[in-house]
């Protein structure tokens, strides 16, 4: 590790002459990931790889440090009154390989990206796209089968960036040079980023050195002063960030939107029927699961779709309202006992397996969850990676704030585990509805169907954290737990 850091430091020696500290020189960033994942190609990107892709490649739009949509290859756009047409005006300039950036070439890139994502959950999010049209000059139109208010957020995903490279790098705002297990990222000149030329622009940017480290190594280097920012923390490794006084920095928690719960993978034995699957959901004290982590503001939910989405009209509420956890566990234990009697296994407990990570927080979560299940007569055991578990811990940040994203994660075509074809059919009806009230009603009904199927047992929103030294600018907590490298590379004026 010391040799790799020395290599990176030598590579930056010319850039950093006379500079020190995050305000004037290089910004050292650790992303909790493996080098293989962090610098992966293709469309199945880890969270870390999404940060790298977004720095080096752009699509029509991108995300800023607050998670808001900003111009990228398109410098402006309009949405028609019916919400079914998004018209983009491409910025001036060429592709990195010198070819002209035209509406026709952008159309071809978009269609290729959409085809590549077929069969993925992000591909399902793109299903309402009916046509991509090249209009006059640098104008591209995306036509939809029905309104998609969050389309810009979907188009800003790194997997939809155009990966074209030339001597000047890719389509994104930064140049990347690999060094060992990391890389050096530097900002391109303004004109290559599609913005007006500015004299002395170099004074307002800094190089960013990114390393792939495991959580323990990243936290250790942060505490030693070798790292300014750590990205990519989750519940599994949060306890590492809480070890010792963080006198040199701050733990920043993203108020993330997404999934955190159990997906039923095996529809046999005790989990064959929805009533027994519901028994598991009833027995969980969600607040107690997360209490050992001492996270302020985290709100448990029994809903598949996180409360507060813009389509949420209150048609689906929290389950078992008015029932105490003791009452729920009594009902759940009765169902477990009845199933054992019906299957002539009165002398054996029900055994279920779970697949989850192996970090300290996962062990703590498993211990609490196993203890709660034991109260209703179920033994919960961990299985190793590669085994087929009964239950899978889902810990996934949403791409956009909509019912559609949550429901698409359990679409039967993805073959991730148990699903509901009835819910999928209702989502399909929602996508074809041109009236937003009708669309929202279908989505609420789809959530209700998926809830009744008990194929997913929600705990609450996912937990994401970062370590950020106090004098670092360009970082903002946001619902997507996405912290763009260009924002971290930009100095305040």
Predicted regions and their residues:
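N-terminal lobe/hinge region of extracytoplasmic solute-binding protein
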Residues: 31-81, 111
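Aromatic- and charge-enriched surface segment that lines or borders ligand/interaction sites
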Residues: 76-119, 221, 270-272
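Gly/Pro-rich hinge or "lid" segments in bacterial periplasmic/extracellular proteins
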Residues: 146-208, 214-217
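Extracellular/periplasmic solute-recognition and catalytic clefts
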Residues: 180-186, 196, 209-267, 291, ...
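Extracytoplasmic/peripheral linker and loop segments enriched in polar/acidic and small residues
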Residues: 381-384, 406-470
């Amino acid at each position: 590790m010391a040799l790799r850091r020395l290599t990176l430091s030598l590579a930056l020696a010319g850039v950093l002459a006379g500079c020190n500290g995050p305000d004037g020189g290089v910004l050292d960033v650790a992303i909790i990931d493996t080098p293989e994942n962090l610098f992966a190609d293709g469309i199945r990107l880890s969270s870390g790889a999404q940060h790298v892709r977004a720095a080096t490649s752009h699509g029509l739009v991108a995300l800023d440090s607050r998670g808001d949509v900003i111009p990228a290859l398109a410098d402006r756009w309009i949405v028609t009154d019916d919400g079914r047409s998004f018209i983009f005006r491409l910025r001036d300039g060429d592709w990195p390989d010198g070819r002209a950036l035209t509406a026709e070439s952008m159309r071809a890139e978009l269609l290729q990206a959409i085809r590549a994502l077929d069969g993925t959950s992000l591909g399902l999010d793109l299903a309402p796209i009916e046509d991509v049209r090249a209009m006059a000059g640098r104008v591209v139109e995306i036509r939809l089968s029905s309104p998609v208010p969050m389309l810009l957020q979907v188009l800003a995903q790194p997997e939809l960036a155009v990966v074209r490279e030339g001597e000047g790098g890719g389509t994104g705002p930064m140049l990347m040079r690999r060094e060992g297990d990391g890389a050096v990222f530097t900002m391109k000149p303004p004109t290559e980023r599609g913005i007006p030329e500015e004299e002395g622009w170099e004074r307002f940017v800094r190089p960013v050195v990114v390393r792939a480290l495991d959580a323990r190594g990243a936290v250790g280097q942060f505490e030693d002063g070798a790292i300014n920012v750590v990205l990519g923390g989750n519940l599994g490794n949060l306890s590492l960030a809480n070890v010792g006084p963080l006198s040199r920095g701050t733990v920043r928690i993203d108020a993330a939107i997404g999934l955190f719960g159990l997906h039923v993978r095996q529809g046999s034995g005790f989990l064959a029927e929805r009533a027994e699957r519901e028994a598991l959901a009833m027995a969980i004290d969600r607040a107690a699961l997360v209490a050992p982590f001492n996270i302020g503001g985290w709100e448990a939910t029994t809903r598949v779709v996180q409360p507060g989405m813009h389509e949420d009209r209150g048609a689906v509420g929290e389950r078992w309202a008015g029932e105490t956890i003791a009452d729920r566990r009594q009902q759940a234990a009765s169902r477990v006992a009845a199933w054992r009697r019906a299957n002539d296994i009165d002398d054996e407990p029900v055994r279920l397996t779970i697949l989850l990570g192996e970090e300290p927080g996962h062990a703590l979560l498993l211990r609490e969850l196993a203890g709660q299940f034991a109260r209703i007569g179920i033994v919960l055991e961990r299985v190793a990676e590669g085994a087929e578990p009964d239950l899978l811990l889902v810990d996934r940040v949403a791409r956009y704030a909509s019912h559609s994203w949550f429901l698409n994660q359990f679409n039967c075509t993805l073959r991730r585990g148990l699903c509901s074809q009835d819910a999928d059919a209702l989502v399909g009806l929602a996508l074809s509805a041109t009236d937003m009230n009708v669309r929202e009603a279908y989505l609420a009904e789809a959530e209700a169907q998926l809830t009744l199927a008990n194929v997913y047992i929600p705990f609450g929103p996912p937990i994401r954290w970062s370590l950020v030294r106090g004098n670092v600018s360009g970082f903002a907590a946001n619902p997507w737990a996405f912290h763009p490298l260009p924002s971290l590379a930009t100095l305040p004026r």
